[in-house]
Regions:
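Bacterial N-terminal signal peptides that target proteins for export
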Residues: 2-10
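Functionally constrained cores in energy, signaling, and assembly domains
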Residues: 8, 42, 270
Length: 279
């Protein structure tokens, strides 16, 4: 009997511990979003030396002229570099340069330069996305060892704006706002060390369940996004199509991907689509 009580007490403690680890943040903590923290969870204040300014709401749509296609002109076109890092002074800035940048200075001492401009914190999101992030903060929790999300369907963006673990930071990147449903034309170059390169051209389409009003909520409940990519050049690859249903909890339901091979005129499942593929 005594052993049974000990086991029951231990199980209860483990349950409480698991609940505390997996719990979303409190309403009081979430209230920091938009106050001392930006709506997406960054520090609103700048740094001590002023090289990183305070966030003041981000870039507004009236910050510069908009062209006929709806693209914003460079609002900082008139700025000049504060200084330029070259092979001659790279040692002075060594603590702020990556190993790759230092290697570039050694390999191309005459031509490789890094002009350093003033920092601007331009990130801004629609009010609905900021509200979604706050909703995520008090509701969303990780499941399946951090490989999935629970209570995320109501918000759909920025799963953990006040992250407590590295996994939650990664989820914020995965669930970031990307401007809604998107269609883009991409040209991909693979340069060689001798300067030669080959080009592959794609048409990409991305759709998010939150921006698909006609989608049955039950069908999209575990889908983060839908992705379609069609190759348009070179001719040997043109017509190939990739379709992906990117799932949220990939332990519960792995990523669904298919490839249409125009040369073979066949559709096949594509389990190899992962990590940095497709490019």
């Amino acid at each position: 009997m005594k052993n049974t009580r000990i086991l029951q007490t231990g199980a209860l403690l483990l349950s409480l511990l698991a609940s505390s680890v997996m719990a979303a943040v409190s309403e009081q903590e979430a209230a920091q979003l938009g106050a001392s923290l930006t709506p997406l969870g960054g520090e609103m204040a700048g740094n001590a030396d002023g090289s990183i300014p305070a966030w003041d709401g981000g870039l507004s749509t009236s910050a510069a002229a908009v062209d006929g296609k709806g693209f914003l002109a460079d609002p900082y076109a008139g700025e000049q570099p504060l200084f330029t890092i070259t092979a001659a002074n790279a040692e002075q800035y060594k603590d702020k340069l990556s190993a790759g940048q230092l290697a570039m200075f050694k390999r191309y001492p005459e031509s490789y330069k890094i002009p350093v401009y003033p920092s601007h914190r331009t990130t801004a999101v629609p009010a609905a996305i900021a509200a979604a992030a706050k909703l995520s903060a008090v509701n969303t929790t990780p499941v399946d060892g951090g490989n999935g999300l629970q209570n995320f369907n109501a918000s759909r963006y920025y799963a953990f704006p006040i992250p407590k673990t590295g996994v939650e930071v990664i989820w914020n990147h995965i669930t970031r706002y990307r401007g809604g449903n998107t269609r883009r034309v991409v040209t991909q170059a693979t340069p060689q060390t001798n300067g030669s390169y080959s080009l592959v051209k794609f048409e990409d389409e991305v759709a998010f369940p939150a921006d698909m009003p006609d989608l049955d909520p039950a069908k999209g409940s575990n889908v983060l996004l839908y992705f379609k990519q069609r190759v348009t050049a070179p001719s040997r690859l043109a017509g190939n199509v990739l379709l992906v249903h990117e799932t949220i909890d990939q332990v519960k339901e792995p990523r669904l991907a298919w490839i249409y091979n125009a040369g073979q005129r066949r559709v096949r499942r594509a389990p190899q689509v992962a990590y940095d593929g497709p490019g």
